[in-house]
Amino acid sequence: MVAQTITLGDTEVKRLGMGSNRLEHTPQNIEFVRAAVAAGLTHIDTAYLYTSGESEQTVGSALDLPRDGLVVATKGGYREGEGKPDVLRAQIDESLRRLQTDVIDLYYLHRVHPDTPLEDSMAVIAEARDAGKIRHVGISEVDVGQIERARAVVPIAAVQNLYNLAQRDHDDVIDHCTQQGIVFVPYFPLRGKDAPAVAEIARRRGRTASQIVLAWLLHRSPAVLPIPGTLSLDHLRDNLATVEIELEQAELDALGAR
């Protein structure tokens, strides 16, 4: 039986969230985010970088309401030089302003940069956490060693890496997160949905290809929380319904074959 919820930080959320890297600041998108939350969405993932800040602005404008039971995550420090303490500190404050909140539920270091020691970047995020600006901390696109270096500075609630049916380079990271009680958030989770095995299982079950690859991810580990991006309420509802799908072992074997 696939678990339908997961504890992210200190909040129980559904095991399907929503990415927002294409979310522009328009009235239509503000209403879409509100409708998505009303439809049952409990986790929204955004970033300082996305749509030049408009994604964070849209989420902030949409969520001028009680946020109990909802986890909003954002990220900073993506481009070269942005992991430096002064830059990252300013990005955290700007994200707070855009999101129209006093505290960010989950804040990721978006990338580890060779020009700034990982520990220095994480220390800034830890400082913001201690100041009450951030509740929980994450890190993105990292290996197991980098996770442990980050954890030596501040507790890590989530790791966000590229992982999907077609790209499985981070199997060891998923296993490590599962063992350590860290949520693993795969981005671009829908890649691989064009595989013949996916089409066959989707046809037989009367489901969409997207639902099948998301279900495969949910079966991969109880620590997995995918964040497919969408601007469609119908697609969002389909994604949220994925937790109802119980794949059989033969189907998992067919999907897992490379």
Question: PLM features: what roles do these ranges have?
Answer:
Residues 68-80, 107, 141:
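A short, structured active-site edge motif that brings together acidic residues
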Residues 16-27, 76-86, 110:
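Active-site mouth loops of central-metabolism enzymes
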Residues 1-70:
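N-terminal binding-site loop/beta-alpha segment at the start of enzyme catalytic domains
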Residues 25-36, 83-99, 143-148:
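Short, acidic/polar
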Residues 35, 39, 98-99, 132, ...:
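Structural motif
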Residues 96-114:
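Active-site groove signature of glycoside hydrolases
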Residues 112-258:
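Beta/alpha (TIM)-barrel catalytic core signal, keyed to glycine-rich beta->alpha loops juxtaposed to Asp/Glu
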